[in-house]
């Protein structure tokens, strides 16, 4: 090999035209193996993929990912645990072909019943791990370098914005409900600012600037699986921003601050204190709290009314705000700034929901102007 060590290679056949002995599994001939070894040595490709298995390669890749966000690290663990149970994880990396990678992902969806988004996350770890192997001269090509949607069915449900009428009906229901009215101000703010839920949870009293009628957004609050509270930078570089407030939004914030419970000990997370909402343990509320509250609100609404309300989450509130602003004619670059998107294509394509009625209204507006 390239280290000068002598190694042996075996095959049941000398030449590719020789017959395979009866009962033996077909494999490359000795001459074919010799050519492959010579080519690998010439190109400085490490023979046998360095003897790494798929699992070992992914573990090495993850071990080198220092300085990433805690939720990114949390996403690696399920992939490693799954590979420990899968025979695919024990394959030597140089034995994995493009067709093997595709067949495995198809198996995950069609046999194991995994969803598209789950498989997308799995491939999101394996592709860069195998690319690391290519960069390290362990492999010639990356077997996971292909368009995922061309291999498995995208069965993920698109998170749609709700209509203006649905938004009005939902907010009216929350405001008038004896139990859920306590959450009205917060949900109104989510619908009318487009804040990410972790940004909203991270807000402190000092960041609501009533004089300037703006909200300072420079961090987000998250809670790990180990129940540890952490402060993270916003999701993108453009996430640090000031979000303007309307009078109605400002009124909601004033009521929230006025009604804010006074804890025995003010919780502090990495230097931040004065969080707007605290739970029963006097700790800051996180995204999971609001997701559950909204889930219960929708369940009660749909038990009462015949016309059902679709699933509404804090992120749907963000979609809805963006969609409403776009339909109202807001400049796309202004909307990108308010949303904190790094790429304007996300603003235009992912969050903006336009249907036929919107198109019809716009055509009539231009025709009559």
Cite the ranges covered by each PLM segment:
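N-terminal core-binding DNA-recognition domain of tyrosine site-specific recombinases/integrases
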Residues: 22-26, 50, 62-140, 156, ...
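Basic, Lys/Arg- and aromatic-enriched nucleic-acid-binding interface segment
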Residues: 120-122, 139-141, 145-203, 210-211, ...
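DNA/chromatin major-groove-contacting recognition/catalytic segments
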Residues: 170, 226-231, 328, 349, ...
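Conserved tyrosine-mediated DNA breakage-rejoining catalytic core shared by Y-recombinases
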Residues: 149, 203-261, 267-268
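Short, basic (Lys/Arg/His-rich) helix/loop patches that form interaction surfaces
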Residues: 172-183, 193, 243, 259-268, ...
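N-terminal DNA-binding module of tyrosine recombinases/phage integrases
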Residues: 2-102, 258-272
